[in-house]
Amino acid sequence: MAETKEFKTLYNLFIDSYLQKLAQHSIPTNVTCAIHIGEVIGQFKNCALRITNKCMSNSRLSFTLMVESFIEVISLLPEKDRRRIAEEIGIDLDDVPSAVSKLEKNCNAYAEVNNIIDIQKLDIGECSAPPGQHMLLQIVNTGSAERNCGLQTIVKSLNKIYVPPIIENRLPYYDPWFLVGVAIILVIFTVAICSIRRNLALKYRYGTFLYV
């Protein structure tokens, strides 16, 4: 897998932005993780998984930074697609990032209903790359069932949208013709990803890595 070209999605840009924001706010991430990710399941093809612990005590700020990163990344998309994806995830683009989103409310309810004590299972949906390429999926364990739920929801949506090399390191970019071209490329590669998917029940179990 190391000899193949990396295949990036909007989720890669999102998680890079999220980690940068955590670092910029000097949030201590050395607190004991109350929640561990026990399993990661989904559809995998040419996908490598990395679990990173970034456990912290400030849940509100962490969710705010998560929403900020999401809004920042989908600014690459046309207005119609931005709003469709945001609505699917449960984030109101007209609200300030610090507002309690529908996503956060849903994840609070999810954690309460499932009574997660210390081990959490994540279903990330799809992680697929074309032949000759690989995808590196970085999952951040925030140490909170609610925040992990938020990341799980975001990865399911953003990890299906391919990022052409021309838009890497160019966030944000608002040229209309550029966005039209990006939208066309995203549609083409989304279809390509769908054509190569296959099912695998388990990708990661706590303490054990499985590569496909």
Curated annotation (Swiss-Prot):
Function: Component of the entry fusion complex (EFC), which consists of 11 proteins. During cell infection, this complex mediates entry of the virion core into the host cytoplasm by a two-step mechanism consisting of lipid mixing of the viral and cellular membranes and subsequent pore formation.
Membrane topology according to the record: Single-pass membrane protein
Factors inducing expression: Expressed in the late phase of the viral replicative cycle.
Species per Swiss-Prot/TrEMBL record: Vaccinia virus (strain Western Reserve)
Record note on quaternary structure: Component of the entry fusion complex (EFC) composed of OPG053/F9, OPG076/O3, OPG086/G3, OPG094/G9, OPG095/L1, OPG099/L5, OPG107/H2, OPG143/A16, OPG104/J5, OPG147/A21 and OPG155/A28. Except for OPG095/L1 and OPG052/F9, each of the EFC proteins is required for assembly or stability of the complex.
Keyword Transmembrane helix: yes
Virion surface side of membrane: 1-175
PTM field: Disulfid bonds are oxidized in the cytoplasm by OPG088 protein. Unglycosylated because produced in viral factories instead of the classic ER -Golgi route.
UniProt cross-references to InterPro entries, sorted A to Z: Virion_mem_poxvirus_L1
The name this protein goes by in its record: Entry-fusion complex associated protein OPG083
Primary localisation category: virion
Domain of life, source organism: Viruses
Residues in compartment: Intravirion: 197-212
Bilayer-spanning residue ranges: 176-196
GO cellular component: membrane; viral envelope; virion membrane
